[in-house]
Structures are given as C-alpha cells and as structure tokens.
Amino acid sequence: MSLGKKIRIGFDGFGRINRFITRGAAQRNDSKLPSRNDALKHGLDGLGSAGSKSFRALAAIGAGVSGLLSFATIAYSDEAEHGLECPNYPWPHEGILSSYDHASIRRGHQVYQQVCASCHSMSLISYRDLVGVAYTEEETKAMAAEIEVVDGPNDEGEMFTRPGKLSDRFPQPYANEAAARFANGGAYPPDLSLITKARHNGQNYVFALLTAYRDPPAGVSIREGLHYNPYFPGGAIAMPKMLNDGAVEYEDGIPATEAQMGKDVVSFLSWAAEPEMEERKLMGFKWIFVLSLALLQAAYYRRLRWSVLKSRKLVLDVVN
C-alpha cells in the first residue's frame, strides 16, 4: 500500500472519530435542556402505547384465525387423500381371553364365496384350512370337489383337469393381472388373504368401506365408472356396493342384513389373515403360567435358601 493511501485512510478514520464524539456531546446537551412539548409528547406516547397494544391484539387474533383455517385446510386435504378415519367397532375376537366366532367365520366364507370371489382372490388359503374352523372334513371335501383344477403333466406330458382336493388353494377369478384390470375398468381387485393386515386399522377399515356407500355430497363430482365412498382414499372407488340386504341366504337362518354380512365377512378375513391367533393366545397363557411357577420357585430359593448361605460367616480359627 502506498504512503499517500495510508495517509488518506488515517484522515478518514480521524474524521469518523471526531464526528462520533461531536454527535454524542450534542445528544447529551439536548437531553439536559427542557422540552417545550413534554406534555404533548407524553400524550402521544400514551396514545401510541395503546395503539400498539390494540395492534398486537389484532395481530394475535388474526394469527389464531389463520392457524385455524390452515389446520382445517390441512385436515380436509388429508381426509380427501387418505379417507375418513374409521370408527372402532367391538370385534368379539379382540379380547385377551376371546376367540373367533366360528359360526360368523362360516357365514363370512359364504359371503365371500357368493359375493366377493367373482373379483377378489385369496391365493394363500387352502380348502384344508377350513377344516375344523368353519366346516367338517366331509363338507370341505365336497366343496373342493366342485372346482376343476388344471394339473399335470401326466405320463403323456399333457396337462389335464381334475376335481379339487383339500390341498388346493382357492381358485383365482382371473388368469392374470392384465385380465383382472381389463374386466374392472383398469382397477386391480386386491388379494384378500391378508387384507385386514395390509390396511391401516384393517378390520374397521374393511367393514366401514363395505357399508359406507352413499351419494356424493354437493360439490363433489365422481367420474363415470367410479362410486363415492368417504373411507376410500380419494373418495372414489371402482368397486360398486356389493352388500345389499338379502344378497345372501344364510344356512342358519340369520337375516342377511348389510351390517351382518359386513361383520361376518370381516370375521372370515380376520381369521384368514391370522389363523394362528387362538393358538398364540393359548400358548401365551401357558408360558405365563410356567414362568410364574419359575418365578415363585426362584423367589423361594432366594428367600429361604440362598439368603442363609449369603449371610453365613466363616470364622478361621488358627491353631498355633
């Protein structure tokens, strides 16, 4: 840096310091002089303070209203995207000591077979799984024999058809996914084997979905080929209402209302998704009983056996 530039920087710095000192002295002198408008200033300050308080109150109210509107908008958009939150129904098999209603499972299988099986598959369920749960072995064999299964190859290397057996899975309604989408306007009917586990709040969701069809509210337009259902994400579903009063004639004579059919088919689907539930609960109680006995035995030995050994003192008597 040149000498002239250093000198200019020094003068600039000195000038700034001088202006700062002069300004501070002037402010101190002004503060000592009495003002002619003190009363007016005091009144204006009070008015400004009241106005600022009112402004802050209005700002707080506006922020609260804006927050409520934002929350309502977010809740509405979330409801439209994910569907309504399903109510909780008192399913009889959800208790700790409860088991499945096997009569309801049998009726639910009847509803699935006559209403749902034309579009939805249950690829993980075999006919033998129904034995002892909803049907006897003879009834299940007769039911399986009603279907035809493509098997093979035979000794000549050709495929053949045969009557169904207990080891066969439930038949598929469509040959492949493309055929299923073509038959349902582009929508793919999901497999129902694990549907109550694959959906959030599964049992309640399936029941609410099956029984909540209604006309769309004012201002909501549904594309042709879709149906309004508030519990389905987006509110528009390709599946029409399938459960109508009297759609199925139960073998035990119970009236087949919409709610009854929905309850029964959900019981059947819950069993299909978790057939080991009853065995798991029973095994849990067995383990609790065994571990309780082990805990009591450990407490006994800890209190009456080990405490004696733990508190024992050994005295070493050294004989000279």
Swiss-Prot record:
Its EC number is 7.1.1.8. The chain crosses the membrane at residues 281-301. InterPro entries: Cyt_c-like_dom, Cyt_c-like_dom_sf, Cyt_c1, Cyt_c1_TM_anchor_C. Residues 1-77 form a transit peptide. Its main location: mitochondrion. Heme c binds at residues 116, 119-120, 239. It comes from the Eukaryota. In all tissues analyzed. Residues 103-210 form the Cytochrome c domain. Component of the ubiquinol-cytochrome c oxidoreductase, a multisubunit transmembrane complex that is part of the mitochondrial electron transport chain which drives oxidative phosphorylation. Belongs to the cytochrome c family. This is Cytochrome c1-1, heme protein, mitochondrial. The lineage of its organism: Eukaryota, Viridiplantae, Streptophyta, Embryophyta, Tracheophyta. The gene is CYCL.
